A protein has these predicted regions:
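A short acidic, often aromatic-flanked loop/helix-cap motif at beta-alpha or helix-coil junctions
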Residues: 42-43, 75-79, 142-145
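Acidic, PIN/NYN-like endoribonuclease modules and their adjacent C-terminal/linker elements
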Residues: 1-3, 108-145
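Alpha-helix capping/helix-boundary segments
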Residues: 10-11, 40, 76, 107, ...
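Active-site neighborhoods of divalent-metal-dependent phosphate/nucleic-acid chemistry enzymes
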Residues: 69-117, 121
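Short, well-structured N-terminal submotif of metal-dependent ribonuclease cores
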Residues: 1-36, 40, 46-64
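Alpha-helical elements of the RecA-like P-loop NTPase motor core of helicases
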Residues: 13, 46, 78, 127-128
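Short, hinge-like loop/turn segments at secondary-structure boundaries
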Residues: 51-55, 87-88, 136-139
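Generic structural signal for small/hydrophobic residues in well-ordered secondary structure
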Residues: 7-8, 44, 80, 111, ...
């Protein structure tokens, strides 16, 4: 299997379930190289409770040391804007909905550029984004969705 990138939804589940959740992240990767997006890192820092800040800091340090952090390029940002414009007209999204999707679209464009598969629990939005600009994504193994 190719490289994987976990969406924020996957890390949040792992943080909420503690050590068992971290073990499940390793099982999800199953020998595949795992990458971290700077977009996901931002979302984690913005939403983490104080007791889990060190876990996020460790993620940042470990992925940076391994040189496996994806940072969106100028082209990723431009493609994100174009995809969100199409998304809005195809799915009748208002401005608030587009703002919520910006990070997901940015994650999709940057991972897609690198040929990295996104693992996410957010099936609805990622399936729609992939119809507008193809990229590889999957639900976590064992997900009911």
């Amino acid at each position: 299997m190719g490289a994987l990138l976990f969406d924020t939804s996957i890390y949040i589940t792992a943080l909420r379930t503690g050590a068992e959740g971290n073990l499940n992240l390793r099982q999800l990767a199953a020998g595949s190289p795992v990458w971290l997006s700077s977009v996901v890192l931002e979302e984690l820092y913005a939403g983490v409770n104080p007791r889990d800040t060190r876990v996020v800091e460790r993620l940042e340090r470990d992925f940076t040391k391994a040189k496996r952090v994806i940072v969106p390029s100028l082209n990723d940002w431009a493609l994100t804007g174009k995809v969100l414009a199409r998304f809005s007209s195809e799915y009748d999204y208002e401005e608030i909905g587009k703002a919520r999707l910006t990070n997901d679209a940015l994650l999709a464009m940057s991972a897609g550029r690198q040929g990295i598969t996104i693992v996410t629990a957010n099936q609805r939005d990622f399936a729609r984004l992939a119809k507008l600009r193809p990229f590889s994504w999957q639900l976590p193994t064992g997900s009911a969705d």
